[in-house]
């Protein structure tokens, strides 16, 4: 079954059908990883369409400083003005699947424009909606290097 799913996923990407919705049909751990990476890239690129796809409508986004934003507020802040993120690099990613819910933990090194790089510990909750995994909750805490 795993070989078949990997083959189908590979075939779908070859046809240009890749993305979060397609990945959800394969291994859920890899589907969540793909959505997480897509979200990071969308935030850095200020890609509103991709952010809308990867973030759940009822998103609760809690920044390391304690500020909490809705999906609309988070996207508006990412899109406002020049790019905010220079890079986001994640390591130590661990994903646990619980039916249609996934919990992702990791460390992230974040570089904002005109700000020294800092490290956070992240906790993400993803839900599968209509065959597509989406980020529904984000929490981060600053940690030392």
Each language-model region and where it sits:
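N-terminal secretory signal peptides that target proteins for export/translocation
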Residues: 1-2
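A beta-strand edge to alpha-helix "cap/lid" segment located at domain peripheries
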Residues: 24-53, 60-145
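Bacterial N-terminal signal peptides
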Residues: 6-19
């Amino acid at each position: 079954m795993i070989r078949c799913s990997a083959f189908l996923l590979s075939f779908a990407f070859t046809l240009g059908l890749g993305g979060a919705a397609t990945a959800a049909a394969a291994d859920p751990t890899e589907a969540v990883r793909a959505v997480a990476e897509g979200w990071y890239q969308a935030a850095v690129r200020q890609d509103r369409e991709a952010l809308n796809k990867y973030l759940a409508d009822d998103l609760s986004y809690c920044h390391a400083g304690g500020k909490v934003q809705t999906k609309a507020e988070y996207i508006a802040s990412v899109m406002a003005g020049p790019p905010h993120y220079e890079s986001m690099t994640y390591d130590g990613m661990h994903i646990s699947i619980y039916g249609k819910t996934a919990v992702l933990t990791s460390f992230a090194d974040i570089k904002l424009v005109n700000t020294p790089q800092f490290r956070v510990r992240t906790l993400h909750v993803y839900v599968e909606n209509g065959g597509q995994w989406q980020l529904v909750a984000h929490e981060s805490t600053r940690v030392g290097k």
